[in-house]
Amino acid sequence: MKINQLAVASTLESGDVMIRIAPLDTQDIDLQINSSIEKQFGEAIRATILEVLSRYDVRGVQLNVDDKGALDCILRARLETLLARASGIAALPWEDRQ
């Protein structure tokens, strides 16, 4: 999936996560995580984000994640919404999910 534009998903409410994405000129993934629960769940947050990016074959992006204690399912939903917005597609290809 090609990320074409800047995008933001969600708010900074308690129990939620705000994610910002921007395209890069390289194939790197620049991931910055700021979380109120980073000491306990930072690695799990990072693993979830990288797994979703890998599933949609996303490379060459900068991600800024401001987590306020979001559950894993919320993190995934926000990230998938963000990817759709940033790639300019109306909806993700749900029929391709396994």
Curated annotation (Swiss-Prot):
UniProt keyword list: Cytoplasm, Phosphoprotein
Primary location group: cytoplasm
Subcellular localization: Cytoplasm
Keyword Cytoplasm applies: yes
Record PTM O-(phosphoribosyl dephospho-coenzyme A)serine, positions in chain: S14
Cellular component per GO, a single term: cytoplasm
Entry-linked Pfam families: ACP (PF06857)
Domain of life: Bacteria
Function: Covalent carrier of the coenzyme of citrate lyase.
Family: Belongs to the CitD family.
Known partners and oligomeric status: Oligomer with a subunit composition of (alpha,beta,gamma)6.
UniProt protein name: Citrate lyase acyl carrier protein 1
Organism of this sequence: Salmonella paratyphi A (strain ATCC 9150 / SARB42)
Lineage start: Bacteria, Pseudomonadati, Pseudomonadota, Gammaproteobacteria, Enterobacterales
Gene that specifies this protein: citD1
